[in-house]
């Protein structure tokens, strides 16, 4: 049973955000170690947030173009 594209488009960013909030609440030194852009930790948190957001808006734009073209 596969989930549809609109469901995955909403579900993946929400799961990624929930994972970030979970790791922020569990890890004791989360804010101290990940605020500097020179640290690798900053980018290891930035990529899991950026990629689902990019995919969401890319698919949203693509679906909008498809719907505009067919109406």
Curated annotation (Swiss-Prot):
Lumenal topological intervals = 27-44
Provide the Gene Ontology terms for cellular component.
endoplasmic reticulum membrane; glycosylphosphatidylinositol-N-acetylglucosaminyltransferase (GPI-GnT) complex; plasma membrane
Keyword field contains Endoplasmic reticulum? yes
Q: Where in the cell is it found?
A: Endoplasmic reticulum membrane
Topological domains, Cytoplasmic: 1-3, 66-71
According to its UniProt entry, the protein's GO biological process terms are:
GPI anchor biosynthetic process
Bilayer topology term: Multi-pass membrane protein
For this UniProt record, give its keywords in alphabetical order, as a comma-separated list: Disease variant, Endoplasmic reticulum, GPI-anchor biosynthesis, Intellectual disability, Membrane, Transmembrane, Transmembrane helix
Q: What is its main location?
A: endoplasmic reticulum
What pathway is it annotated to? Glycolipid biosynthesis; glycosylphosphatidylinositol-anchor biosynthesis
Q: Which domain of life is it from?
A: Eukaryota
Membrane-spanning residues: 4-26, 45-65
Is Iron-sulfur among this UniProt entry's keywords?
no
Q: Which Pfam families match?
A: PIG-Y
How is the quaternary structure described? Component of the glycosylphosphatidylinositol-N-acetylglucosaminyltransferase (GPI-GnT) complex composed at least by PIGA, PIGC, PIGH, PIGP, PIGQ, PIGY and DPM2. Interacts directly with PIGA; this interaction regulates glycosylphosphatidylinositol-N-acetylglucosaminyltransferase activity. Does not interact with Ras proteins.
**Database matches in PANTHER family:** PHOSPHATIDYLINOSITOL N-ACETYLGLUCOSAMINYLTRANSFERASE SUBUNIT Y
Misc: PREY and PIGY, 2 apparently unrelated proteins, are respectively the product of an upstream and a downstream ORF contained in a single bicistronic transcript.
Q: Which disease is it linked to?
A: Hyperphosphatasia with impaired intellectual development syndrome 6: An autosomal recessive, multisystem disorder characterized by severe developmental delay, dysmorphism, seizures, cataracts, and early death in some patients.
Role:
Part of the glycosylphosphatidylinositol-N-acetylglucosaminyltransferase (GPI-GnT) complex that catalyzes the transfer of N-acetylglucosamine from UDP-N-acetylglucosamine to phosphatidylinositol and participates in the first step of GPI biosynthesis. May act by regulating the catalytic subunit PIGA.
| Protein name as annotated | Phosphatidylinositol N-acetylglucosaminyltransferase subunit Y
The organism named in the record is: Homo sapiens (Human)
């Amino acid at each position: 049973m596969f989930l549809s594209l609109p469901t995955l488009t909403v579900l993946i960013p929400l799961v990624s955000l929930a994972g970030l909030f979970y790791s922020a609440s569990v890890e004791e030194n989360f804010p101290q170690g990940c605020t500097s852009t020179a640290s690798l930790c900053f980018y290891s948190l930035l990529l899991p947030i950026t990629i689902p957001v990019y995919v969401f808006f890319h698919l949203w734009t693509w679906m909008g173009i498809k719907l505009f073209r067919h109406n």
